[in-house]
């Protein structure tokens, strides 16, 4: 059996923000994929995750891609652009060009790309119509760059209307909760041709209610706007949670 060395790069989506464990750590779909992959093989895999929240797409590529490739992975997952789409201006073609760079460099190194589109938060966000339009445009632009490439593993989350519904999102309405991360992990494992624990597609709904009205703007939108105005990021000073390989051993059929 060939070895699997899987590395994830990206922003909060791939870091796992919103999937909070009791000990304070954040797990996320990429961690779940690593566990599900090891379970399906019945043997361990190597896993690294260089994703850092708050990153725009080109800083992801410029800061994470080469360190990820230096690890000599067999598989690399990539998603980005969500933070770019929240800015006043978003150059869709330039964002999509980042995907071209990742595909080219992975081709150079013989690495299989797992290409993800992000989950769609627009139905519940202020300026949701703008975000929806930009996300649709970005999805088309990225898929055009991957057209005819049967060697790319595609896990397309943006069109998933179930995933866009409130039960899959954290109180900030911008990051998925554990339920959302499990659904994305299920889609990635399915795209890899691996078995998926059926409940991962739709875990029991959490009962935690998020803030509404002005409370939502005060708790979540206000801090985000302050970071934009001060030129800071939620990822400033944060290091990757798995910058080097960590071994993931098989466990039971569910990694919850």
Language model features with spans:
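Serine-esterase "nucleophile elbow" of acetyl-processing enzymes
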Residues: 1-53, 65-72
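Oxyanion-hole/transition-state-stabilizing segment in secreted/luminal serine hydrolases
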Residues: 15-19, 43, 57-94, 120-121
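Short glycine-enriched, charge-decorated loop/helix-capping segments at active-site entrances
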Residues: 19-24, 90-93, 128-132, 170-171
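Aromatic/hydrophobic pocket-lining residues that form the small-molecule binding cavity
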Residues: 61, 95, 99, 135-139
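Active-site segments of SGNH/GDSL-like serine hydrolases
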Residues: 79, 83, 105-136, 157-165
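Charged, glycine-enriched surface loops/patches
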Residues: 93-116, 149
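Substrate-gating cap/lid alpha-helix
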Residues: 123-158, 178-182
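Conserved catalytic region of serine esterases and O-acyltransferases that act on ester linkages
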Residues: 150, 172-175, 179-256
């Amino acid at each position: 059996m060939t070895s699997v060395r899987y590395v994830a790069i990206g922003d909060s989506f791939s870091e796992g923000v919103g999937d909070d464990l009791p000990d304070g750590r954040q797990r996320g779909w990429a961690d779940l994929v690593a566990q599900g992959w090891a379970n399906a093989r019945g043997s361990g895999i190597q896993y690294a995750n260089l994703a850092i929240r708050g990153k725009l797409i080109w800083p992801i590529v410029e800061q994470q891609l080469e360190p990820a490739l230096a690890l000599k992975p067999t598989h690399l997952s990539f998603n980005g652009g969500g933070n770019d789409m929240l800015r006043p201006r978003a150059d869709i073609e330039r964002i999509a060009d980042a995907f071209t760079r990742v595909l080219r460099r992975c081709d150079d190194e013989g690495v299989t790309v797992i290409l993800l589109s992000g989950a769609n938060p627009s139905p519940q966000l202020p300026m949701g119509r703008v975000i929806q339009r930009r996300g649709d445009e970005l999805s088309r632009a990225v898929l055009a760059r991957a057209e005819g490439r049967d060697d790319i593993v595609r896990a397309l989350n943006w069109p998933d209307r179930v995933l866009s519904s409130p039960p899959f999102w954290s109180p900030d309405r911008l990051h998925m909760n554990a339920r959302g991360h499990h659904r994305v992990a299920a889609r990635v494992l399915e795209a890899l041709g691996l078995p998926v624990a059926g409940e991962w597609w739709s875990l029991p709904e959490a009962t935690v209610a998020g803030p509404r009205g002005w409370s939502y703007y005060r708790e979540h939108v206000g801090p985000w706007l302050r970071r934009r105005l001060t030129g800071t990021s939620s990822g400033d000073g944060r290091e990757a949670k798995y910058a080097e390989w960590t071994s993931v051993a098989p466990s039971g059929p569910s990694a919850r």
